[in-house]
Amino acid sequence: MTDALKRLSDEGVAIWLDDLSRKRITSGNLAELIDQQHVVGVTTNPSIFQKAISQGDGYDQQLADLAVRGVTVEEAIRMITTADVRDAADILRPVYDNTGGKDGRVSIEVDPRLAHNTHATVAEAKQLAWLVDRPNTFIKIPATEAGLPAIAETIGLGISVNVTLIFSLERYRKVMDAFLTGLEKAKERGLDLSQIHSVASFFVSRVDTEIDKRIDALGTDEAKAQRGKAAVANARLAYQAYEEVFGTDRWAALEKAGANKQRPLWASTGVKDKAYSDTMYVTDLVAPNTVNTMPEATLLATEDHGEITGDAVAGSYERARADLDAIEKLGISYDEVVQLLEKEGVDKFEDAWNDLLKSTEAELKRLAPSKG
């Protein structure tokens, strides 16, 4: 056992857990992770809730109560998921208070079927914020083209946002622009900018998974030399973009008005390829004012044998650019890969949501009172 998680936290990395279930809440496990593993936030997504609700009996009582009331499947899902987020937010509330609202956050995602509908996404974000009714909630909005104006409008309403499914550097810059636009709207409306927080979830491991697959198809030694380099390089260049945007006069004016920076959040940090270190997407992306949301296995691996040796991003930009250029020269299109990953990301969450609808409907029918 190492003190890696403490050192990670000391380096300015907020450690969040990429998982939530009722069992994790009621068993005291979440409180234990906060107390002992330096966890200061939680992220959820449709896949996480689908897994949580379809496994075990932790939701049976609430589902039975909802079945008696005759609620729709979608109403049931919203009541179940917002209840978990609300309870997790209450457990994390002391962290929220102690960090001035920066951490102690729980994220809940808008219906992924709305990813390409700006107005419906904003309406859903407002409804979720109202339903959870906790100040330490982040509403997750995907960084699709339609999501960008929704992000700006939601921030402009004073709602804190976790922007998700970011894969490309170009899209990340647009996300930061949407965030700044939202803050400018909020300022015009007379809102307190200091109460608005945001993170931008930049996905990591999926980039290596897709690019490595294409490298393996090429099969040359030159190609194989680039395995496992794309994701970290991409994320490091994202941090460079973050430094540039939050060094502008536009940002300075908002900061003077009380605004908080939108932090980069490294998401999808579980290592899929056993050839790599199981902590590489943590140890190789240590940088000040970032968040790393980890599956529990990655969190525990980092605690056990993670080597935290200070800032791993500063001074890395030239090497990172060279790595991406070398991959492009192999004939692997960066733009094609990141566009595919965004589409697949939205599709995966939509599929998980549809599976959640089906399994919840089946449970409501099973637990409904018999007629007669």
Swiss-Prot record:
Keyword annotations of the record: Cytoplasm, Pentose shunt, Schiff base, Transferase
GO BP term, example: carbohydrate metabolic process
GO cellular component terms given for this protein: cytoplasm
Active-site residues, Swiss-Prot/TrEMBL: 140 (schiff-base intermediate with substrate)
Reaction equation(s) it catalyzes: D-sedoheptulose 7-phosphate + D-glyceraldehyde 3-phosphate = D-erythrose 4-phosphate + beta-D-fructose 6-phosphate
Biochemical pathway: Carbohydrate degradation; pentose phosphate pathway; D-glyceraldehyde 3-phosphate and beta-D-fructose 6-phosphate from D-ribose 5-phosphate and D-xylulose 5-phosphate (non-oxidative stage): step 2/3
EC main group: transferase
Major localization class: cytoplasm
Signal peptide: none
Entries under Pfam families matching the protein: TAL_FSA
EC number: 2.2.1.2
Molecular function terms, GO-annotated: transaldolase activity
Domain of life of the native organism: Bacteria
Subcellular location: Cytoplasm
Transferase is among the record's keywords: yes
Sequence similarity: Belongs to the transaldolase family. Type 2 subfamily.
UniProt-listed NCBIfam families: PRK03343.1, tal_mycobact
Entry function: Transaldolase is important for the balance of metabolites in the pentose-phosphate pathway.
Entry protein name: Transaldolase 2
Organism: Streptomyces coelicolor (strain ATCC BAA-471 / A3(2) / M145)
Gene that this sequence comes from: tal2
